[in-house]
Amino acid sequence: MQAFVQFLGSNPYILLFLTIGLAVWVGKFSIKGYGLGAVAAAIVVGCLVATVGAAYGVKFHLDEFAKSLLYYLFMYGVGLRVGPSFVNALNKESINYAILAIIAPILGLAIVVLGTQFFGLPLGAAGGMLAGSQTMSAAIGSAEQAVSAGVLSLGSESPEQISAMIALSYGITYIWGTVGIILLCKYLPRIWGVDAKAAALEFEKAHGVPNVDDAGLTAFHPFDLRAYRVENPESIGKTVQQFRTRFPQYQVVNVERGDQLLGPSAETVLQQGDVVALGGRLEEMTANMGMLGPEVPDARALNIPLDQAEILVTNKEVTGRPLKTFRGSELAGQIQLQRVERSGVPLPIGLETTLQKRDVLFVTGLQPAVSKAGEIFGVIARHSSATDLLTLSFGMILGFLIGLIEVPAFGAKVGLGNAGGLLLSGIIVSSISSRLRFFGNTPNAARNILEDLGLIGFVAIVGINAGADLLTQLTGAIALKIFIVGFLASTIPPIIVWAIGFHIMKINPALLMGATAGARSHSGPAREAAKEVGSSVPWLGFPVGYAVSGVLLTVFGYFAMVLAH
């Protein structure tokens, strides 16, 4: 064991990725659906590894540059994720959700600061308690930034000791922070004597939102593709264009003649024995049996690739129209609408869902039909899995430049710093990209790498560097005080947010369940709320608050450290 510990001490890269791998593995374990998750596990595993190393006389310490770089990548990734929703929160339809998402973090910050001062907790406790009680692991980074930026008077304590206290406070408060908000979002309607399930059903009927129990994948397909052998004398000798004119409800997608595939050319003259592949709505395919001839199981003729595209809604003729008005259009049986996004936020697809300018439609269907849909709705963009590294690089540079800006205030110079600058630049880039769709493409998988690897790696380094000093600061009295403050900071804000949303803003209780979860920037409670009411309605109240509170809680780790001392 001694040799292995020394090996890790002399090979920091192996140490780092061993910690990350173990954290992801440990984070997968759960008891009745509750677990640490990879990020919380990273700080636990990091501290444990460092403690084991110290027991064998090896003090692990990883490079500060690597730690900062990982955190900066994470912050930019957060900006990319929340940007469209954050900007969308500024419109009048979302303002109530945004207000709730501002109230909750401010209350949590105030309770943490006052609790730290009341109990006289040591440096670092405030930042860790905020991160743990609000289940916002990113706040650990901004709390660390307060130490590295030199805005705190450290006294006799070392940066490593403060980092250890941040990690300790985070670990003590995280469990209730996670479980508590789930229980509150799930049971607050019952405490208030409200039937949230009935409220969800009422909202579904009024807005055409599909129920969560509706099958997401069924054997029924409204669009069908079939092959017919041309034997009907009325069709022999007619061109494909003439056939389309007579039967506009069908899409000719292929013509097979002997060993040749002629495609769907309008000038092609149909001959006896040709095999024609037709696409259309299922009811239409069975309405005119024999129009060409008998149906045949010709796999070669039916081997038609489907197309996928993202369509940016720009045409005035379609904006303001609910989806139900397109049910009778020629495209209704030829393309399938997978999802709709507005400012980067997915919308439930219902009959009353109204299209707005700059909405993005994700469609699948036959290539000609997809192209036609692009002409009808606006501008088409093909799906791409490539990341625009040029925009990513300049977005990072913009963030660092914003971080350099400082303004005089209260006798000192104040600025966003690198982390805040990158968060802001990510918001700017993703907001523009979500509207134009033709630059700055960062697929979800690529953005997840920035966020997941960045945050887990950063937190792992914090744990490794702080672990050796952790046990020296842990006492029962301090741990109890930290838990009490964390419990209050986690429990009180959601209750107040619910009361304001229900009594003052008159928000539908099912929506408010999701809004309360969003105000704490935690998707778990929204998921449980959806299960509780048997509807997807709570998710509608979630995205705006999730974006706004996520940004605020991320930077509030810094303010918790500064204001508490």
Curated annotation (Swiss-Prot):
InterPro entries: AAE_transporter, RCK_C, RCK_C_sf, YidE_YbjL. It is a multi-pass membrane protein. The chain crosses the membrane at residues 4-26, 33-55, 68-90, 97-119, 162-184, 389-411, 415-432, 453-472, 482-504, 539-561. GO terms for cellular component: plasma membrane. Keywords: Cell membrane, Membrane, Repeat, Transmembrane, Transmembrane helix, Transport. One of its GO terms (molecular function) is monoatomic cation transmembrane transporter activity. GO terms for biological process: potassium ion transport. Pfam families: Asp-Al_Ex, TrkA_C. Residues 210-295, 296-379 form the RCK C-terminal domain. The keyword Nucleotide-binding does not apply. PROSITE patterns: RCK_C. It is found in: Cell membrane. Signal peptide: none annotated. It comes from the Bacteria. Belongs to the AAE transporter (TC 2.A.81) family. This is Uncharacterized transporter BPP1579. It comes from Bordetella parapertussis (strain 12822 / ATCC BAA-587 / NCTC 13253).
